[in-house]
């Protein structure tokens, strides 16, 4: 009887060792570590320019924008300001101007620039600032002008977006690619037709344009309150 008793004790001891050496579920939750390489989605090449394309020049800008416009068909953007946001539609008829605006938007050029010129009951003009970063962005993107496209029948109705001429005196009315203005005057500013290129229009939020146009300005027509903007492409 005693011998049988000790056999039972030894058997239980052996079973206990075996059980203690086997794995048991851990009640503490831990993050799972994947043993396989994660799948990383590659960013779309659409809208990306080669480093060799920049900075753009008077010789390279138009061929670049022609190619860029064909590869980037977006035509809507949102402009955010301290007084609210508004949406714009860019016209297909003005190929280079549409492509240029989309290109600069994707370069984040407009972010941090201002509506720096306000003429009451006439226009608001944006795309410039007195910040160092704006000049740096322009140097990186390039020095170039856009040709006029004024024979497409588009008129300077209230709410349209147009391209101001360069400050450089030229008989061909070449436009500064970095700035734009929006007609606030009602029903329009038709005396501008034929001299400036209409390339888009406001499709939502014209009340925001009116609010910016009502801001007090200094003698240079610069708003006393900086109207910083942020521009994003809507239909990517």
Predicted regions located by residue number:
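Intrinsically disordered, low-complexity Ser/Thr- and Pro-rich stretches
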Residues: 2, 18-19, 23
């Amino acid at each position: 009887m005693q011998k049988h008793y000790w056999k039972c004790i030894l058997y239980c001891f052996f079973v206990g060792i075996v059980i203690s050496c086997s794995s048991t579920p851990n009640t503490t939750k831990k993050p799972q570590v994947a043993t396989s390489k994660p799948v990383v989605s590659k960013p779309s090449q659409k809208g990306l320019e080669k480093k060799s394309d920049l900075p753009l020049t008077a010789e390279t800008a138009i061929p670049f924008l022609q190619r860029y416009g064909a590869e980037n068909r977006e035509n809507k953007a949102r402009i955010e300001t301290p007084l609210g946001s508004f949406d714009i539609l860019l016209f297909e008829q003005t190929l280079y101007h549409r492509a240029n605006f989309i290109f600069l938007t994707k370069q984040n050029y407009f972010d941090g620039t201002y509506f720096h010129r306000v003429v009451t009951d006439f226009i608001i003009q944006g795309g410039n600032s007195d910040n160092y970063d704006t000049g740096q962005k322009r140097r990186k993107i390039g020095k170039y002008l856009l040709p006029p496209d004024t024979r497409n029948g588009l008129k300077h109705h209230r709410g349209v977006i147009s391209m101001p001429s360069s400050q450089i005196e030229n008989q061909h009315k070449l436009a500064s690619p970095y700035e734009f203005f929006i007609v606030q005057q009602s029903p329009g500013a038709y005396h501008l037709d034929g001299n400036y290129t209409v390339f888009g229009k406001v499709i939502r939020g014209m009340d925001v344009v009116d609010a910016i146009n009502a801001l007090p300005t200094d003698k240079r027509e610069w708003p006393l309150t900086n109207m910083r903007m942020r521009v994003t492409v809507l239909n990517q």
